[in-house]
């Protein structure tokens, strides 16, 4: 149960009949309003808490076939959001299992101090995830406009001209320049928003994204942070795409 950071959903698997599906760790004094929530696997009223000293772990019977179906992903997330509304929570990634109550209590006891400390740090906070992209065509035009070497090599290799070495050199130069520009953009955005966050985690972006960053924000500043992110996005104008999600359970700040 120690691996609590977000990760891709697991492949379909069969769980032993007595296995438990794990949702989150909270303090044992958390209200734990679980009534009406649907468990992963579609069972209503199956959620409960296993307590160990100052900690509690929200569980339900594991479904026989654990698959990342949309309804189960939604059920997992709904539990996190209900818990987060009432207090600090350490959300588990989708698909985490434990053999039985005894194993859960042992896991809670084994990292009791760490979990209690982390719950204190995450009290009254939420995660915001921001992804941002810029059109690669725009970036390429910028490289060719601002880099004499890139422009010269591009002209030399246009219409099939130049040597193989010229084409390789152009490709390598453009790739480096794109990385530099994307990194610079990411640093600018993170620098602007970090002032309003208690913490940040920057992950590797995918595709044309130049940014994939998560910010830990005090819940009292959630609207302020959202507004600042929207204003920042508007300032970059056309050619940029910003995608903000939140408030979310603080998956990125558990480990």
Name these PLM-found stretches:
Residues 1-255:
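An interfacial alpha-helical scaffold signature
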């Amino acid at each position: 149960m120690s691996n609590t950071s977000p990760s891709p959903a697991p492949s379909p698997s069969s769980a032993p009949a007595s296995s438990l599906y794990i949702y989150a760790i909270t303090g044992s004094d958390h209200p734990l309003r679980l009534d009406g929530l649907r468990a992963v696997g579609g069972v209503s009223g199956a959620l409960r808490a296993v307590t160990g000293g100052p900690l509690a772990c929200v569980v339900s019977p594991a479904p026989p076939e654990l698959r990342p179906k949309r309804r189960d992903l939604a059920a997992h997330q709904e539990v996190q959001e209900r818990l987060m509304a009432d207090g600090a929570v350490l959300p588990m990634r989708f698909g985490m299992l434990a053999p039985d109550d005894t194993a859960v209590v042992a896991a809670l006891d084994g990292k009791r101090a760490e979990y209690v400390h982390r719950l204190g740090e995450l009290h009254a906070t939420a995660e915001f995830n921001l992804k941002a992209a810029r059109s690669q065509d725009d970036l390429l035009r910028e490289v060719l406009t601002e880099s004499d070497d890139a422009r010269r090599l591009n002209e030399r290799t246009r219409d099939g001209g130049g040597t193989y070495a010229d084409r390789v050199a152009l490709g390598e130069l453009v790739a480096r320049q794109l990385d530099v520009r994307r990194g610079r953009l990411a640093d600018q955005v993170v620098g602007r928003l970090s002032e309003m966050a208690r913490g940040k985690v920057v992950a590797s972006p995918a595709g044309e994204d130049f940014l994939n960053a998560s910010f830990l924000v005090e819940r009292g500043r959630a609207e302020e942070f959202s507004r600042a992110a929207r204003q920042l996005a508007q300032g970059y104008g056309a050619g940029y795409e910003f995608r903000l999600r939140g408030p979310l359970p603080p998956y990125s700040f558990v480990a």
